[in-house]
Amino acid sequence: MPTITLPDGSQRSFDHPVTVAEVAQSIGAGLAKATLAGKVDGKLVDACDLIERDASLQIITPKDEEGLEIIRHSCAHLVGHAVKQLYPNAKMVIGPVIDEGFYYDIAIDRPFTPEDMAAIEKRMAELIDKDYDVIKKVTPRAEVIEVFTSRGEDYKLRLVDDMPDEQAMGLYYHEEYVDMCRGPHVPNTRFLKAFKLTRISGAYWRGDSKNEQLQRIYGTAWADKKQLAAYIQRIEEAEKRDHRRIGKQLDLFHTQEEAPGMVFWHPAGWTLYQNLEQYMRQVQRENGYQEVRTPQVVDRILWEKSGHWSNYAENMFTTSSENRDYAVKPMNCPCHVQIFNQGLKSYRDLPLRMAEFGACHRNEPSGALHGIMRVRGFTQDDAHIFCTEEQVKKEAADFIKLTLKVYADFGFSDIAMKLSTRPAKRVGSDELWDRAEGALAEALNESGLAWEYQPGEGAFYGPKIEFTLRDCLGRNWQCGTLQYDPNLPERLDASYVAEDNSRQRPVMLHRAILGSFERFIGMLIEHYAGAFPAWLAPTQAVIMNITDKQAAFAIEVEKTLVQSGFRAKCDLRNEKIGFKIREHTLLKTPYLLVIGDREVETRSVAVRSREGVDMGSMPLEQFAQLLAQAVSRRGRQESE
């Protein structure tokens, strides 16, 4: 009979097979009441599952990360229960967990409305109040098919067909409603009280636009109502910071239907964009990168050689001319290999670091486009390092150091680094993968920072490092990458002359720090809510006169600051000074300079910050020094 070993090393013996819930009850009534599921020998199981042999057991409660995921998954099933009660003809598709929530795809003959979503949420709350048990039944395949056939759940039957090797499946019953899942799920609906439906959208069956359209209901669920309230507050803050709203408020950019997924940059937004590009150009030059420029439109022949035509054609914009097929480049790497291939390269030329602010275009589905975060036309801070296998570790270590410096300059210090390792389907020997993964792991270790493995998540041809930034709202943004690639140099016949005069293939390291400029600017807008650090702000200082008498000196101040390399402008409108201050505060200009008669007499400026802090009057030279210091700090705090 089983002996159960708990996380603290203590053991409990039973004279009969025992469920997770029964083990929890033997420890204490409080734990039993909080038990969602269990982890038996590292595998998640339902609270009702039997343990028949000696095993280690961790009781899962809402406080555990896995517990939160179980709550969210069970809430998705609860959506199904409510929808089927309200709309009996709806057909349920799938309801997975996503970051901070869940969704359920539903086939129904009309789009859901906000009123429908409110009705579904109300019915879910009513079902939770019934405090019913969720019943799990491991059911033979034939019976599963019978259950869903009798209910007309066509999509569930298709999902069963996708699992030909499964002879028995878990069915979870919410009263009269049944759903299919690997589980585990909550034992009772009382665990689901802290939930909220958040939005509705369209989706396609299996994510393919050629298939039928479905309705998708998104929601979130948490361990308790306090966590839910904090999440809702965070979402409301995120809505206030939406880059589309702030972009319009600050007159940075716009998008329009005639050019879907393309950005119209206005003067202020283009200034911000240029700040990023000039900064990246400087840091790359300081770190040994040579900047290049490659064509936008390239013959199909190159894309066939690189493999993009067969694997990526549906995402490429194509055209024809004079009986030749072309594609607008979706990425820069094949073109960079063409530059490398011009002229004989020696081992003495390596590492060769080639950078381009490459404008790329990808035919993203129209439904996936989102402001400037998800676009069809974008520019990358793209670079490729051609090196020997022995040089990979140092190049990777240098890149990590550079990337972390850049992120710090933009005000991001909470960085997660992950190493994605070999997938099951891959090319290359295990020895090659061992060396490649080992070099990247050693480079990560040299950074002195924590990092983690992502087993099996590498590309089929090589491992990669990913950098994820956490913003002020706790959201994660995957930005930088370093991809090890021995494959493309092989396909495009890149080589160098080794020390022994033999021809060898270089390793190619694909790398980006910001990624898409458009997406990174969208992140910056939301992270700073448009109140950019002085070095990035489109206008760093605005000079405002109180009356026409001070206009000449205001213009002189503007000219002096501009000649010193600052972005300053005058506001000489015949408006009250309070009106001007309010307007430029809303435009989030870092420094507001007010000039009255006293400032003209003393050749000084009265300085206010956009936060409303009165910094007093000071000589123009002193303000210029203050602004220069703020610019030199970039996005770092004064203490850094």
From Swiss-Prot:
Its cofactor is Zn(2+). It is found in: Cytoplasm. Its EC number is 6.1.1.3. Zn(2+) binds at residues 333, 384, 510. Keywords: Aminoacyl-tRNA synthetase, ATP-binding, Cytoplasm, Ligase, Metal-binding, Nucleotide-binding, Protein biosynthesis, RNA-binding, tRNA-binding, Zinc. One of its GO terms (molecular function) is metal ion binding. Disulfide bonds: none annotated. The keyword tRNA-binding applies. HAMAP family: Thr_tRNA_synth (MF_00184). This is Threonine--tRNA ligase.
